[in-house]
Structure formats: structure tokens, C-alpha cells
Regions:
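DNA-recognition helix of helix-turn-helix
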Residues: 74, 85, 136, 151, ...
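A short pre-motif secondary-structure segment
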Residues: 139-143
Length: 183
């Protein structure tokens, strides 16, 4: 989306007469990107859909809180990240599994998921990513899958670029170690 388009969209979102139509455009424009960001965090298609409903509901109900000093996509990504992390925290509190069961669970769940179109290596990568701490997982996903610049991630996660680079490199090392152990 160009800067001019974004500015126009922000104006439409601010105007009660055009707000609904503008928000529908936001959903069309960013919905798929947000879905895949959420899906990489929560892994399950059904869980991702549930989180996405919360993301869109929160975005709609908090339109007045949107400060136009950042891009719409950055604001939406932040909501998606927070909702995904909240979901994962709630899920962790509900289900306690051993590490061995958890390792089997993610790969098997992904391979059984009709919406997962990856191969066994992709399932193992997701398994390795799932074992990362929340922040490292988030940084890795944003950098690796979304190809975001450190400066964009810094703005999104409200942290320094140096800390992000360290988190990313530690995550890559942990993923590499995971593959060495499971070779």
C-alpha cells in the first residue's frame, strides 16, 4: 500500500461515515498476512482463526486508540502479536505436557492438519520454532518468514535493534542445534 493510499485509508477510518467500509478494506488488505503471522505462532489453523477473530475485533473496537504516527500494518501486527502471545500463555496454563510429548505433538499435529501443506522437514522446523521462548519465536518469525527489517521489528515490539539481532541469532542457533540433535 502506498503512503498516499495509507493516508487516505487513515482518514476514512477516522470518519464515522466511511469507517465501516474502510475497515473492510483493512481486513481485505491485511487479513491474510496477519493470519499467517498468527498461524506461525499458534500453529493450528483453528486456533489461528480464533485468534484472528480477536485481532479484528480488538482492532475494530480500538480504532479510536490508533495513533496515526505509525502505519496501519504496524498497529495491526502489534495487536496480532499480543493476541497470539496471550493465546499461547493461556494455552500453556491450561495444558501441561512433558517435553517429549510436546516434541511429538507439534510435528504430529501439523502433519495431521489438513491445512498444513509442508513436508516433514517443514514440520520439524515448526517443532524447533515452537520450542523457542516467545520473544525469540516472534523475532525469528518476523525476520525469517515476513522478511521484516530489524528497524520495523523494533518499532513493532518496542525494543532495540541490538536486542532483536541477538534474539534472532540465538534463535537460529537453537534451531540449528535442534536439527543436529534430530538428524
Amino acid at each position: 500500500m502506498t503512503a498516499a493510499d495509507e493516508k487516505q485509508l487513515m482518514q476514512q477510518l477516522s470518519d464515522p461515515a466511511t469507517q465501516r467500509k474502510a475497515f473492510e478494506r483493512v481486513v481485505r488488505e491485511y487479513g491474510e498476512q496477519l493470519y499467517w503471522q498468527v498461524r506461525r505462532i499458534v500453529l493450528s489453523h483453528d486456533d489461528a482463526n480464533d485468534v484472528m477473530q480477536n485481532v479484528m475485533l480488538k482492532a475494530w473496537t480500538h480504532l479510536d486508540d490508533f495513533h496515526q504516527d505509525s502505519r496501519i500494518s504496524t498497529w495491526l501486527y502489534r495487536i496480532a502479536v499480543n493476541e497470539s502471545l496471550d493465546f499461547m500463555r493461556r494455552k500453556k496454563n491450561q495444558i501441561v505436557v512433558s517435553t517429549d510429548d510436546g516434541e511429538l505433538g507439534v510435528a504430529n499435529t501439523l502433519m495431521a492438519d489438513n491445512y498444513f501443506d509442508g513436508d516433514e522437514t517443514q514440520a520439524q522446523l515448526q517443532e524447533a520454532i515452537a520450542q523457542l521462548p516467545d520473544v525469540q519465536r516472534m523475532v525469528f518469525n518476523l525476520r525469517y518468514y515476513d522478511d521484516m527489517k530489524y528497524s520495523e521489528i523494533s518499532q513493532l515490539l518496542h525494543t532495540s535493534e541490538g536486542a532483536l539481532k541477538a534474539s534472532y541469532h540465538i534463535a537460529v542457533k537453537k534451531i540449528s542445534d535442534f536439527f543436529k540433535r534430530h538428524d
